[in-house]
A protein has these predicted regions:
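Short coil/turn segments at beta-strand junctions that form active-site/ligand-binding loops
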Residues: 2, 48-51, 166-167
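Short, hydrophobic/glycine-enriched beta-strand segments
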Residues: 3-9
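Short glycine- and Lys/Arg-enriched binding-loop motifs that mark or flank ligand-binding interfaces
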Residues: 6, 18, 28, 87, ...
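Short acidic/His/Gly/Ser-rich catalytic and metal-binding motifs that mark active-site loops
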Residues: 12-17, 122-124, 133
């Protein structure tokens, strides 16, 4: 029987600043690196052999995985990176402070954007100041400007079913 271990990336610079991150390719904080080390130590205590790793194309996720693998002394060459595992795209909210957005639009509206299954945040404008921070490894025809949780589900689940679950 195979095990599936899910680990969220460590704290990023924008997590710390309470900014919507989504597809913006933002680095880990030192605390985030420590969180990844701690996750690696917990996995090591379980004495589970890692055969395959999957990560998004976002450097905070890739760096978290690399830190974990270093703790495990695992020179795993079977690392699969895919933009299809990226976090949800927060559209126009990307890079904005969550508290400021709540003040501007109200807690109820922000919760609708964040928690509704089929409601997307406003789409990212072509002149958005964070446009250049969006992950670059996405085929142009697949690039979106916002995602609902449903959109994210419809992107991630087929990847899981085709690439991860068969292992």
């Amino acid at each position: 029987m195979n095990n599936l271990i899910l680990v969220r990336h460590g704290m990023s610079l924008w997590n710390k600043a309470k900014r919507f991150t989504g597809w913006a390719d933002i680095d880990l904080t030192e605390h985030g690196k420590s969180e990844a080390k701690y996750a690696g130590k917990l996995i090591k205590e379980l004495n589970i052999e890692i055969h395959s790793c999957f990560t998004s194309e976002l450097k905070r996720a890739i760096n978290s995985l690399n830190i974990i693998l270093k703790i495990l002394s695992n020179q795993n060459n079977n690392i699969n990176k895919s933009w299809k595992l990226n976090e949800r795209h927060y559209g126009e909210l990307t890079g904005l402070n969550k508290d400021e957005i709540i003040k501007k639009h109200g807690h109820k509206q922000v919760n609708i954007w964040r928690r509704s299954f089929d409601v997307s945040p406003p789409p990212m404008n072509t002149n958005h100041p964070c446009k250049n921070k969006i992950c670059k490894n996405i085929p142009k025809e697949k690039m979106v400007v916002t995602e609902s949780l449903k959109d994210t589900y419809e992107r991630v689940i087929p990847y899981y079913n085709n690439k991860i679950e068969p292992l």
